[in-house]
Amino acid sequence: MEKSTMSAVVLVLNLLVLHLQYSEVHSLANTSSEHDFGYLKFVYNAVDLELEGSYDYIIVGGGTSGCPLAATLSANYSVLVLERGTIATEYPNTLTVDGFAYNLQQQDDGKTPVERFVSEDGIDNVRSRILGGTTIINAGVYARANESFYNNSGVEWDLDLVNEAYEWVEDAIVYKPSNQSWQSITGTAFLEAGVHPDNGFGLVHEEGTRLTGSTFDNSGTRHASDELLNKGDPDNLKVAVEAAVQKIIFSTESSGLTAVGVVYTDSNGTSHRALVSGKGEVILSAGTLGTPQLLLLSGVGPESYLTSLNISVVASHPYVGQYVNDNPRNFINILPPNPIEPSTVTVLGITSDFYQCSLSSLPFDTPPFSLFPTTSYPLPNQTFAHIVSKVPGPLSAGSLTLQSSSNVSVAPNVKFNYCSDPVDLTHCVSGMKKIGVFLSTDALKPYKVDDLPGIDGFNILGTPLPENQTDDAAFEKFCRDTVASYWHYHGGAIVGKVIDGNFRVTGINALRVVDGSTFPATPASHPQGFYLMLGRYVGTKIVQERSASGEAIHTSTFKPKLMDSLKSALSFAF
């Protein structure tokens, strides 16, 4: 065979492999079941932990990436996970599909799973405070990132391993949603509005209309990253809840600046130390707000800024807390003349300029915090549909700063600078114009209160779309005036600025970051699938790297006292 022909064959085979990786839906969790709390046998309240302990890996944050990362590493090494929140059995409403709105409605008492904050843009927002992270409080939408994200990420991915990591997650906690009336109508309207092609059911982020995966099963039970802890080795894995990590401990001995442990406090305010043994590491998985905050409090960040706060500079890192972005969420609420059934987001409309979806809801007396931009937004007195457009990327970047220079429990300040980049504003305008086309479809006619053409005839809750679909200035004003958070904020410790392509903090040994702070753009319309995969992926890469070096595997067995509340939770779970 000629060389050119052989090269062509190889190219075709490689493209086929990539196509299979990104287009085929592999096995999902296929039966509804209770949330699996088997892992509680190795979960402890931090008050019951030793004042000083040693572990191969210390993971700060038991959230979307932290849980799969911990489970993976525990197959070979001793692992401690430090989570500032508590467990889901303390808040059973987190475990149902109805809990999404309910948990946003609960007042923040300093312990609830949803921590409220208002960005310096003046927009309401939330972060998680529970084992399982945002996978315990979100809307359950599951998608894989697309090929272009990997190509532009600054990381040399092993795409076979990426695919295996996705499957590892999906087999445990991802479901194909059942048919929901409003979601079916949403899909029909997207297609009628020109969001093509019809991709049927699939998980990969790609242009067109599709039914995507969900972490809610068809009985309405939530499944989340905490359940992935069940895949870990219980003899090697310890999870401490209500453990607030205060700072990273560093050493400057002959090997250079090295992370050697962390200091954390329990709910009684007692200080503990967890130290790294052997060639282990500290891995930060505390999220977009928590990870940059902890780096700054530990003396890793912009030198002049740290000095101004009287924080001793351990390592000058000018980009810690920079490139913090949040995807704008703009929307229209319609109040149909007849009740519609509540539904979670399962149908997506994807284009290169915007991502769209919709949910339907019962009315409520207490507003779900951050569903609308501010608490002064009008409340629905009947069932309603919330039709959403998301700006990809985004290119508009903000920053994170400390509100307290000594107390990790005081949330940092963050400003996202929504739509400050003109490209983002253009994408928002395009998206909201497409929602105008969506509202004008035949599929949406039964949801009008008056039989009027185009976008007219709907009972709109809040700000309506501009009447003139060609008035870009009016749409730009709409985008600025109605912006809300999509809860998909990211960045602050990004690849190429703070960490390298192996997720190691540059200039510091034994310190990595594996969470949503690592990339300056959202990896898909809904990012939880990517970050679940990322925990498994990086954990597997670490095990492979250490195994290839011929290191002996270190294991240890933990037998501290179970806290009383977890004993009762165990009896509840089983």
Swiss-Prot record:
Keywords: Disulfide bond, FAD, Flavoprotein, Glycoprotein, Lyase, Signal, Vacuole. Its main location: other. Glycans are attached at N30, N76, N146, N151, N179, N268, N310, N381, N407, N468. One of its GO terms (cellular component) is aleurone grain. Gene3D superfamilies: 3.30.410.40, FAD/NAD(P)-binding domain. GO terms for molecular function: flavin adenine dinucleotide binding; mandelonitrile lyase activity; oxidoreductase activity, acting on CH-OH group of donors. Monomer. Involved in cyanogenesis, the release of HCN from injured tissues. Catalyzes the stereospecific addition of HCN to a variety of aldehydes in vitro. It is a major seed constituent, and could have the additional role of a storage form for reduced nitrogen. This is (R)-mandelonitrile lyase 4. The gene is MDL4.
